[in-house]
Amino acid sequence: YTDRKSGFAVQIRLRILIFGLCGRNGEFMHKTEQEGLKYQKLYNWAHTLITSGVIKNMDKFPSETSLQKKFGYSRQTVRTALRQLEEEGLITRVRGSGTYVSYDSSGVNGERPQIGLLLSYYSDYLFPRVYDGIEASLTEKGYGIEVAVTKNRLNDEAIYLEGLLKGNVSGLIIEGSRSAFPNPNIRLYKEIKRRNIPTLFIHNHYENMPFDSVEMSDSRSAYELTRILIENGHRRIGGIFKYDDRQGIERYKGFVQCLSDYGVKFDDDCIRWYSTKDMEEKLSKKGLLRMYRRTKDCTAMMVYNDEVADYYMEFLEERGLHVPEDISLVSFDD
């Protein structure tokens, strides 16, 4: 995000962004450009969910109204994305009943050896990129994918792991669920280890489990983002963090470590927390208002990810507050 005090815009790779809704040349995007990007994000999200088999053939597809509510997009944006999906034969509208998936992914992998891909959630901006990258690499090596989404529920993780083990998968790629907490599915992970099934965690890992992982350095990244804010004059810095995933805890660690190292006062009231279970409530307009009332004196905020940042920026805009003129935001992912 563009900084409020200096007006600078910095982008740190490793999926971290300091961002001011700017175009390629640093100019603010027109509303039509923003709507076009939103339509493409929604289309990519839906296309990946359908072709990966997360939403299966003949399953009911979310309605226009539910998609508007989920993403905060206009009806026209949602309709444009759905129209393209329908034109490609991925969904079918049934008058008086709703919209249904009309794509069968069951025969795509054929007899190829399978890799189980277990993700904790699917979001509009990140899930398609993660899935597409993994699929491309595995397909090149002759593997198919069995994908499942736990919605960050440990019970669902157990069900899917049991199913994948019964299916004799050749390997596992796992994004941990509620990874900040002790995991109750130790028995299943011990069985994975006993069978010597190659297993790799992405984005996070579980404590005391002997598996390799590929992760962003969340703590270090948060430290660097906080340092940038401090070096540009901010002394009243708040944050919105997620407490049930390791990424949120690590980002909080980096944040408070940087404040301490630079002698900037930490204020409990300026830190707001949420989890998967209460995310909808905390990121509703009422929930964001409660957060804002506790943090309104902050000149800068660190936000858990760009999904939350979008909600918060929209809330601020509705109150006549603008990024970067009135407040600076730093965030992760995108």
Residue ranges and their predicted role:
Residues 1-7, 13, 17-28, 41, ...:
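Bacterial carbohydrate/catabolite-sensing allosteric modules
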Residues 4-109:
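N-terminal helix-turn-helix DNA-binding module of bacterial transcription factors
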Residues 64, 131-132, 252-253:
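Short amphipathic alpha-helical segment that frequently serves as the phosphate-/nucleotide-binding helix
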Residues 64-65, 154, 219:
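The beta1-alpha1 cofactor-binding region of Rossmann-like NAD(H)/NADP(H)-dependent oxidoreductases
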Residues 105-112, 175-188, 277-280:
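Short, flexible, glycine-rich and Lys/Arg-enriched loop motifs at helix boundaries
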Residues 106-171, 256, 261:
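Amphipathic helical "hinge" segments at domain boundaries
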Residues 118, 173-175, 300-302:
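Structural motif
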Residues 121-124, 151, 177-181, 242-246, ...:
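Short histidine/acidic/glycine/proline-rich micro-motifs that form metal-
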